[in-house]
Amino acid sequence: MGLHFPGTDVYTTRSHTQVDVWIWALTYTLVYTVLPLIWLKKRGFSLKKLFSSFRWIRDLWIIIAYWALDFFGPILSGSTNFLGGINANQYAQGISLGILVNTLGAGLPVVVMMHMIFIPRIAVLFKSKFTVILLGGLFYSIFSLFDPGVDYGSMETTLTSITYIIMTQTLVGMGKSTFTVVTGNPFVHFITLHVISARVPFDTKMYIEIFKIK
């Protein structure tokens, strides 16, 4: 089980079921969203105050520009087969369902654990924004150690997997951290560099197959 479904497995047709998806999504929601929010609330945290501090109009150009880059980039580069082979109804239901389960299993856990708990506390300890962004990136890479494609079956593949994740996902995490450090809004990355952007072209057809959407 990892940050992005199906964890350390590589998805193939009929390799995973709807039950697998919901177990992953609900487990990550409970462990990395609900319980941490309860902990934050006991320490005086207020979601109402957090949302009232956002400046959506100021940040709108960032959201649109980077969402477009992260959404269309994989499609135009040919790294995903998002276009073609399915009908409009499958697109509509597959995209909606994918956003829902990815929000529960990946989006909200990252928002809460990284952007609402880790980054604000690191920002208090370090004056350098770059240091905060770098440590945020490293945190995200650790969060990604059980993402699809890694292999911990032997010492050699374990070292290769860890090295690969840290080298690639640290940069991704730094991008996510930058949005929060610059805007103060932990949800900007959620739209621009996560669930509503790249995960849509990468995951839609997988969820259409798993949930047998016609």
Model-based region annotation:
Residues 13-26, 42-72, 94, 124-133:
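Interfacial transmembrane-helix boundary/kink motif in multi-pass membrane proteins
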Residues 35-40, 66, 70, 74, ...:
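Structural signal for membrane-spanning alpha-helices in multi-pass inner-membrane proteins
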Residues 60, 64, 78-96:
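Membrane-interface helix-loop-helix regions
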Residues 31, 69-77, 110:
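Alpha-helical transmembrane segments and immediately adjacent membrane-interfacial amphipathic helices
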